Structures are given as structure tokens and as C-alpha cells.
């Protein structure tokens, strides 16, 4: 009966034996080779997925760190800018204080010099008055001692003028 079915299907016994051998081989390969190969492929797929997941996590961490670094850099730049602004302000204030102190000192020295000059002027005027008084007294003594005629009077006035011209002013 099997022979008639095979013959009707145009199959021969060799083909049937080969088919049975192939099916047994597939079953054995499935038990022995396919399961380990599929298991190895599945493990490899899991490793690749884990690597991709780690890479994504690392990328997220790198992006987070880059954002933190950018924020810290911006903060440091702002702090440096603020520090420079404060230092500039303090420097300008110190410069203004120095200029104000120098102007005050210059004014004080000027006032002192003016006061010194005024004292010296008053002293010189006092000395001049003293000399003029002394010369006037001398002239009066000479007038009293002499009977003055006009040429003697002129000579006496010339002498007084010459002596006044010799005074240090």
C-alpha cells in the first residue's frame, strides 16, 4: 500500500529515506545545534541591547554633565565679570579719594603759602615804616640843627630820598 501511494506521488523509496533522514537531522540539529545557536543569538541580542542602553545612559550623563559644565562656566564668567566690576569701582573710588586728598593738600599748601606771604609782606611793611620813621627822625634832627635855607633843604631831601632808595623792600 505504501508502495502504491509512493508510486502515485511519483516518489521512490530513496527519496522517502532521504526525507526521513533530513527530518531526523533537522530534529537532532534543533535539539543539539539550533537551541544553543538561538540561545547564543538571544544572549548576543541582549548584550547589544544592554550596550545600546548603556550608551544611551552614558550619552544622557554626558549631556547632563555638559549642561552642568556650561552652567558652571557661565556662573564663573558672571562671577569674574562681577569681580572685575567691583574692582574697577573700588579702583575708581580710590582714585577719586587720592585726587580729593591731593587737592585738599594743594589747597592747604596754597593757603599756607598765601598766609606766609602775607606775614612776610606785613613784616616788610613794618620794617619799611620803621626805616621811614627813623629817616624822618634823622631828617627832622638835621633840620632842627641847621638853619635851613633852600639849597640846604634840597640837599637834605635828596639825602633822605637816597637813603629810602637803599632800604630793602
Curated annotation (Swiss-Prot):
The keyword Transmembrane applies. GO terms for molecular function: proton-transporting ATP synthase activity, rotational mechanism; proton-transporting ATPase activity, rotational mechanism. The keyword Transmembrane helix applies. Keywords: ATP synthesis, Cell membrane, CF(0), Hydrogen ion transport, Ion transport, Membrane, Transmembrane, Transmembrane helix, Transport. It comes from the Bacteria. One of its GO terms (cellular component) is plasma membrane. Coiled coil: none annotated. F-type ATPases have 2 components, F(1) - the catalytic core - and F(0) - the membrane proton channel. F(1) has five subunits: alpha(3), beta(3), gamma(1), delta(1), epsilon(1). F(0) has four main subunits: a(1), b(2) and c(10-14). The alpha and beta chains form an alternating ring which encloses part of the gamma chain. F(1) is attached to F(0) by a central stalk formed by the gamma and epsilon chains, while a peripheral stalk is formed by the delta and b chains. Belongs to the ATPase B chain family. PANTHER family: ATP SYNTHASE SUBUNIT B, ATP SYNTHASE SUBUNIT B', CHLOROPLASTIC. F(1)F(0) ATP synthase produces ATP from ADP in the presence of a proton or sodium gradient. F-type ATPases consist of two structural domains, F(1) containing the extramembraneous catalytic core and F(0) containing the membrane proton channel, linked together by a central stalk and a peripheral stalk. During catalysis, ATP synthesis in the catalytic domain of F(1) is coupled via a rotary mechanism of the central stalk subunits to proton translocation. Component of the F(0) channel, it forms part of the peripheral stalk, linking F(1) to F(0). This is ATP synthase subunit b. It comes from Heliobacterium modesticaldum (strain ATCC 51547 / Ice1).
Amino acid at each position: 500500500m505504501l508502495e502504491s501511494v509512493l508510486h502515485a506521488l511519483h516518489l521512490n523509496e530513496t527519496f522517502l529515506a532521504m526525507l526521513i533522514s533530513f527530518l531526523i537531522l533537522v530534529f537532532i540539529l534543533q535539539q543539539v545545534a539550533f537551541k544553543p545557536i538561538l540561545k547564543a543569538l538571544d544572549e548576543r541580542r541582549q548584550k547589544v541591547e544592554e550596550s545600546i542602553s548603556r550608551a544611551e545612559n552614558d550619552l544622557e550623563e554626558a549631556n547632563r554633565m555638559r549642561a552642568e559644565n556650561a552652567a558652571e562656566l557661565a556662573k564663573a564668567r558672571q562671577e569674574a565679570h562681577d569681580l572685575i566690576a567691583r574692582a574697577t569701582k573700588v579702583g575708581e573710588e580710590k582714585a577719586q579719594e587720592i585726587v580729593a586728598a591731593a587737592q585738599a593738600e594743594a589747597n592747604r599748601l596754597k593757603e599756607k603759602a598765601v598766609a606766609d606771604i602775607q606775614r612776610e609782606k606785613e613784616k616788610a611793611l613794618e620794617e619799611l615804616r620803621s626805616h621811614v620813621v627813623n629817616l624822618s627822625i634823622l631828617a627832622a634832627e638835621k633840620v632842627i640843627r641847621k638853619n635851613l635855607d633852600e639849597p640846604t633843604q634840597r640837599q637834605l631831601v635828596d639825602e633822605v630820598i637816597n637813603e629810602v632808595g637803599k632800604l630793602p623792600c
